[in-house]
A protein has these predicted regions:
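Short, well-formed alpha-helical segments that are part of the catalytic scaffolds
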Residues: 16-39
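Anionic-ligand binding region
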Residues: 133, 141-166, 172
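Short beta-strand-to-loop element that shapes/binds the nucleotide-sugar donor at the catalytic cleft/hinge
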Residues: 123-141
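Conserved N-terminal catalytic core of the sugar/cofactor nucleotidyltransferase
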Residues: 31-92
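N-terminal nucleotide-binding beta1-loop-alpha1 segment
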Residues: 1-16
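Short beta-strand-to-loop acidic/aromatic patch adjacent to the donor-nucleotide binding site
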Residues: 91-101
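Conserved alpha/beta core of the MobA/IspD/sugar-nucleotide pyrophosphorylase nucleotidyltransferase superfamily
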Residues: 161-256
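Conserved donor-nucleotide/metal-binding helix-loop-beta segment in metal-dependent transferases, i.e.
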Residues: 84, 105-129
Length: 256
């Protein structure tokens, strides 16, 4: 079984332009993410999945500089990009991350791969981690089926193809560690205030190497004023996700 981490990233962004290239402590957001993802032990490789748009050439250079693979595909059809990348690298299972989430937890990437080995699930979500730290797992065979049934070419938000069709074995990896279990914290970067919070976390915790998620949670619990920085963004984030999660299928689907 061959697995990989896919980093979904483009420089195109409406709410916070070129956010993956914003710098903290001398590194871009996406480079901090790559550094963290390298801590995962089970994936066979890390692939930066970006678009063929010339504006994303800079991301190709970042991948080369940081010693990871890169694949370029359709700018808007993310599922198509995933499928072609999975074929190119001959993968069986992928763990999906986003380039604007520098705190993605490598421990739960390994847990997700182990969970897949136990269940052979088509689609795995992670329940309990803060927004911006969890991932999704996809069996490549299921990804190919999803690409066959989708009726849209813009699949930036794609989870519904797996969860709403009734065609896939959907499983949930639940977080049992009470220290990091916290779904009320938002650590993704969608708005300027999000970036200010992330920057403050790095300023306090980053000493030249990756710091664990537990330290981030501890910092935020001990300093509740930090969560006030992007408090208003959480509702915007949730509303935007709900707006984008509707998906269209080519034909009616049936539960197996």
């Amino acid at each position: 079984m061959k697995s990989a981490i896919f980093i979904t990233a483009r420089t195109k962004s409406t709410r916070l332009p070129k956010k993956v290239l914003l710098e903290i402590k001398g590194k871009t957001i996406i480079e901090h993410l790559i550094e963290r993802l390298k801590m995962a032990k089970l994936p066979d490789l890390i692939v930066l999945c970006t678009s063929t748009n010339p504006n994303d050439d800079v991301l190709v250079e970042i991948a080369k500089k940081n010693g990871i693979e890169c694949f370029r595909g359709n700018e808007d059809d993310v599922l198509d990009r995933f499928e072609k990348a999975a074929d190119f690298f001959n993968l069986d299972f992928i763990v999906v991350t986003w380039g604007d989430e520098p705190f993605c937890d490598p421990e739960y990437i390994d847990k997700m791969i182990d969970f897949y080995k136990e269940t052979n699930a088509d689609y795995i979500n992670c329940e309990g981690l803060p927004a911006g730290t969890f991932t999704y797992g996809l069996k490549v065979d299921a990804l190919k089926r999803a690409c066959e049934i989708k009726a849209e070419t813009d699949t930036e938000i794609w989870g519904g193809y797996f969860t709403e069709s009734g065609m896939f074995d959907v499983r949930t990896l639940k977080v049992e560690d009470e220290i990091i279990k916290n779904s009320n914290i938002t650590l993704t970067i969608d708005y300027p205030e999000d970036f200010e919070l992330v920057k403050e976390i790095f300023n306090r915790l980053y000493k030249g190497k990756v710091f664990p998620l537990k330290e981030i949670i501890k910092l935020l619990k001990e300093n509740p004023e930090l969560q006030e920085i992007n408090k208003n963004c959480q509702e915007l984030y949730e509303a935007n996700i709900k707006r984008l999660t509707k998906v269209k299928f080519k034909k009616p689907t049936k539960v197996k």
